[in-house]
């Protein structure tokens, strides 16, 4: 029995010692109890050490106090209260908003609280533009915006909010003027959709647009969203903005129009120079002051309407000569005013030019072969029809002699009063062009290639 009692005392003492060796231990002033294992010691207080330099025994932990630190059993450590998994929600605008039946409150942002349908009937019901779905007693159907029921009458918004119908849903919008209203029919002084105080207009932007060659237009600002879930502070958004845009109907360049009179041969004439040809006939034709043709700075030939004055004495009178210009490009052409005719110098290319300036013969415009033509002012009455050989041609008292363009052989020709007869000098290729610059004959100088041009300036009636 004594042994059993002793064992119980030892166990009790051991339990108490393991529980806290410093339990009921009182140390002198400036000393503190330290438990190491199952022993308690009184040690001087050293506050500067703290728990970082003091280690407690097994099953104990150091606890700092205002003026000291001590070792406490670990099982005496109070367990912290666990935080709730979800904090209590703060009151929102929906706590102060009353929506119509079958509508639920949704906080879009701090400025917008919308009442949206609590079912998906109208959400999946498609309505055309200008109408909205309304789920009434007859079920979902589309109602025009003008006849859509104003659900704001049965909607109550929280303080400082005003109800507006947005896409068929009552929506509470914050009043920016600070005026509180609970009346569904109240209209705030400043509507949230009102444009801000200053928005750029075309009055300010037009000078900058015009300087860049653009025009100013006023368009709807795509940044202002009107959807319920996209509504932001619309007061800070300009509903209409001014932009610089290109004018699709305007022209970027000026149009230059030229007046082109038409001669008797049907070819176009462009004015830039003056040609005067005076012709008199006394038994034969005489070609007076030569033709003058100037070249424009762009390299294209410019030929003026020719004025021909014709007088006859005992001979036929030809119609006023025609100067026709259909030339696309005439480069480097210089025509001097010689005594006997036309002088062409360094004519490189003359394309598509038809010049008819005959006194008494056939005027051919752009035709290489003349068939069955009768020359009306010919001395010998020559009719040329695709002729390669010209015979029995008499030129009497001619200054310019016989003008032959593209003729291979001239047979039996008599020049009665010609100074130099017919002269062709270094004509490499002369295609349907005759240039006379001689007192008594024909002179073609350094004409390399003249293509597609027909010049008729004959006295004796030959026109090629």
Swiss-Prot record:
Cystine bridges: none
Superkingdom, natural source: Eukaryota
Domain Follistatin-like: 21-43, 121-143, 151-173
UniProt GO BP: spore wall assembly; sporulation resulting in formation of a cellular spore
Main location: other
Region feature (Disordered): 250-320
GO CC terms of this entry: cytoplasmic vesicle; spore wall
Signal peptide: 1-17
Compartments, record wording: Spore wall
Record carries keyword Glycoprotein: yes
InterPro entries reported for this sequence: Fol_N (IPR003645), Spore_Coat_Assembly (IPR053121)
A single GO molecular function term of this UniProt record: structural constituent of cell wall
Residues annotated as glycosylated: 111, 247
Keywords: Glycoprotein, Repeat, Signal, Sporulation
UniProt subunit comment: Binds to the C-terminal region of pspB.
Entry remark concerning the domains of this protein: The N-terminal part (18-235) contains the information required for insertion into the coat.
Function according to Swiss-Prot or TrEMBL: Forms a triad with cellulose and pspB that is essential for spore outer layer formation.
Protein name stated in the entry: Spore coat protein SP65
Organism name: Dictyostelium discoideum
């Amino acid at each position: 029995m004594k042994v059993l009692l002793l064992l119980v005392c030892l166990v009790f003492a051991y339990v108490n010692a393991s529980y806290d060796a410093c339990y009921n231990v009182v140390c002198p002033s400036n000393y503190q109890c330290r438990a190491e294992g199952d022993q308690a010691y009184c040690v001087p207080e050293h506050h500067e050490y703290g728990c970082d330099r003091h280690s407690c025994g097994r099953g104990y932990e150091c606890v700092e106090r205002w003026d000291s630190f001590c070792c406490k059993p670990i099982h005496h450590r109070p367990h912290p209260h666990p935080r709730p998994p979800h904090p209590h929600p703060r009151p929102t605008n929906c706590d102060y908003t009353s929506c119509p039946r079958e509508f639920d409150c949704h906080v879009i942002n701090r400025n917008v609280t919308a009442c949206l349908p609590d079912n998906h009937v109208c959400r999946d019901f498609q309505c055309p533009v200008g109408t909205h779905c309304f789920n009434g007693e007859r079920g979902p159907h589309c109602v025009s915006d003008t006849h859509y029921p104003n659900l704001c009458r049965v909607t109550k918004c929280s303080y400082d909010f005003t109800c507006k119908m947005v896409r068929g849903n009552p929506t509470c919008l914050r009043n920016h003027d600070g005026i509180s209203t609970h009346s569904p029919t109240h209209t705030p002084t400043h509507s949230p959709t009102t444009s801000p105080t200053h928005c750029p207009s075309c009055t300010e932007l037009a000078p900058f647009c015009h300087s860049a060659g653009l025009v100013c237009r006023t368009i709807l600002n795509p940044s202002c969203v009107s959807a319920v879930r996209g509504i932001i502070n619309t007061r800070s958004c300009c509903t209409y903005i001014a932009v610089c845009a290109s004018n699709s109907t305007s022209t970027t360049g000026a149009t230059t129009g030229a007046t082109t009179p038409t001669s008797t041969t049907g070819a176009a004439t462009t004015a830039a120079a003056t040609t005067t040809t005076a012709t008199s006939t006394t038994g034969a034709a005489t070609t007076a002051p030569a033709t003058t043709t100037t070249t424009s700075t762009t390299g294209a030939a410019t030929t003026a309407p020719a004025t021909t004055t014709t007088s006859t004495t005992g001979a036929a009178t030809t119609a006023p000569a025609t100067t026709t210009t259909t030339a696309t490009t005439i480069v480097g052409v210089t025509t001097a005013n010689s005594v006997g005719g036309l002088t062409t110098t360094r004519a490189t290319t003359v394309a598509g030019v038809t010049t008819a300036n005959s006194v008494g013969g056939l005027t051919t415009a752009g035709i290489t072969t003349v068939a069955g033509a009768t020359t009306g002012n010919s001395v010998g009455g020559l009719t040329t029809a695709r002729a390669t050989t010209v015979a029995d041609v008499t030129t009497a008292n001619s200054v310019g002699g016989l003008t032959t363009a593209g003729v291979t052989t001239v047979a039996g020709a008599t020049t009665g009063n010609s100074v130099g007869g017919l002269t062709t000098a270094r004509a490499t290729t002369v295609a349907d062009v005759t240039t006379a610059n001689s007192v008594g004959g024909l002179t073609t100088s350094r004409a390399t290639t003249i293509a597609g041009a027909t010049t008729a300036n004959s006295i004796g009636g030959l026109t090629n």
